[in-house]
């Protein structure tokens, strides 16, 4: 039976195992005193979290039992440090990838009598800058943080106290969401995303399950501030074949709605279809322009696929039609060896008056502020399949056939 939440805070120290299940987690990153372990700010952070009633996991990249630095045995101390460094780095990277939030508190000190320089902190900061799960803070007097400010301040808020930094983190995590086994390695905002869940539920439905997971890349729409695309590297146990496959990436984005707007002729190859011509950066053809059916996606979770299709048809070719005229053809992946998202294809049969009006339309369509600049074309099916990619070829032929 799944637990709904943890009763108290769980602290995991350097090189200790991740918990078997959790609802939320944070990693405390930032400079550590090289010798004066008792002055580490992590102890104060745990006290603050306890007072806040935080009941999730806290990863601390320090040893549970502190061993004083021996100034009289510098060589021995350096050998010990080298021996544990690789294990420490591997543990830290794994936990930072898996956790739901990374707290960077950077009270950097560069005094001769007390060093807390934070060189490793700088590396980790840059490594996880685009993870969309950082919570950053530093005292005003902390030196050498200007560069970190410059590369992050457009995306993240900098807090001036440790308490404020932790408060923002705890508020973001909220009640969390229950995960167990390998799911613990999936950050909360990824696990909860529609893109991931659409893929993951299908795996579970056929008896597959995760044996490993690593997040590789994620893209948040700059204006909407919403997660749009994810690239992750899963290890999957395949129930049908009784084996594990772990050498592929999954590109997950929001599902899409496309519309085949057509005027029917006796010979389906002579039937006329509407195509959108637009420059898209990935294009790789002789004309360096994309020719495709009207379509797109919505970041609004309340939009259904039909509403999205209706909206896209109006935006991209200027045709506003009653939703009752849209007929759903099929729901399929567009490129199943790489991308997990699906396309739902609708078709709309146009009248002679509508198709003739579109033939005369020389205006530019699309949402200009989203950099869309769309020219519409009316082509026969035979002409269209020579212009479009394989995905659109399949959609046109299936839509016309059915």
Tell me what each language-model feature is:
Residues 1-183:
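Conserved catalytic or regulatory cores that recognize and/or transform ribose-phosphate-containing ligands
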Residues 28, 128, 309-313, 317:
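Hydrophobic alpha-helical segments that mediate membrane insertion or helix-helix packing
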Residues 29, 80, 113-116, 247, ...:
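Conserved short-loop catalytic and cofactor-binding motifs
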Residues 43, 90-93, 97-100, 291, ...:
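Internal, well-ordered alpha-helical scaffold/interface segments
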Residues 138-150, 364-378:
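Short glycine/proline-rich, acidic loop/turn segments that cap or connect secondary-structure elements
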Residues 181-293, 297-311, 318-370, 377, ...:
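N-terminal leader/linker segments that precede catalytic domains of diphosphate-processing enzymes
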């Amino acid at each position: 039976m799944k637990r709904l939440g943890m009763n108290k805070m769980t602290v995991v120290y350097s090189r200790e195992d991740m918990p078997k299940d959790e609802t939320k987690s944070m990693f405390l990153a930032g400079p550590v005193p090289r010798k004066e372990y008792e002055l580490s700010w992590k102890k104060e952070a745990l006290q603050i979290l306890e007072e806040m009633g935080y009941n999730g996991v806290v990863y601390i990249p320090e040893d549970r039992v502190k061993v004083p630095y021996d100034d009289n045995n510098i060589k021995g101390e350096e050998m010990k440090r080298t021996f544990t460094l690789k294990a420490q780095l591997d543990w830290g990277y794994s936990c930072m990838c898996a956790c739901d939030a990374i707290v960077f508190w950077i009270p950097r000190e560069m005094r001769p009598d007390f060093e807390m320089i934070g060189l490793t902190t700088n590396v980790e900061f840059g490594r996880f800058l685009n993870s969309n799960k950082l919570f950053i803070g530093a005292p005003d007097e902390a030196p050498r943080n200007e560069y970190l400010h410059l590369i992050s301040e457009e995306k993240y808020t900098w807090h001036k106290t440790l308490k404020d930094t932790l408060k923002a983190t705890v508020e973001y995590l909220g009640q969390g969401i229950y995960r167990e086994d390998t799911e613990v390695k999936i950050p909360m905002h990824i696990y909860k995303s529609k893109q991931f869940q659409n893929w993951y539920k299908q795996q579970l439905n056929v008896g597959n399950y995760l044996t490993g997971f690593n997040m590789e890349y994620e893209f948040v729409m700059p204006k909407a501030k919403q997660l749009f695309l994810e690239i992750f590297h899963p290890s999957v146990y395949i129930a049908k074949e009784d084996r594990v496959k772990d050498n592929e990436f999954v590109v997950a984005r929001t599902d899409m709605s496309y519309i085949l707007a057509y005027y029917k002729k006796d010979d389906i190859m002579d039937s006329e279809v509407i195509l959108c011509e637009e420059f898209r950066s990935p294009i790789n053809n002789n004309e360096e322009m994309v020719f495709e059916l009207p379509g797109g996606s919505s970041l609004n979770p309340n939009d259904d696929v039909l509403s999205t299709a209706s909206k896209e048809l109006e935006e991209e070719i200027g045709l506003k039609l009653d939703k009752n005229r849209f007929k759903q053809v099929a729901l399929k992946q567009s490129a199943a060896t790489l991308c997990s998202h699906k396309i739902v294809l609708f078709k709309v049969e146009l009248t002679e008056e509508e198709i003739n009006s579109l033939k005369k339309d020389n205006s530019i369509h699309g949402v200009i502020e989203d950099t869309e600049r769309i020219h519409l074309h009316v082509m026969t099916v035979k002409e269209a399949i020579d212009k479009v990619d394989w995905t659109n070829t399949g959609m046109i032929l299936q839509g016309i056939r059915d």
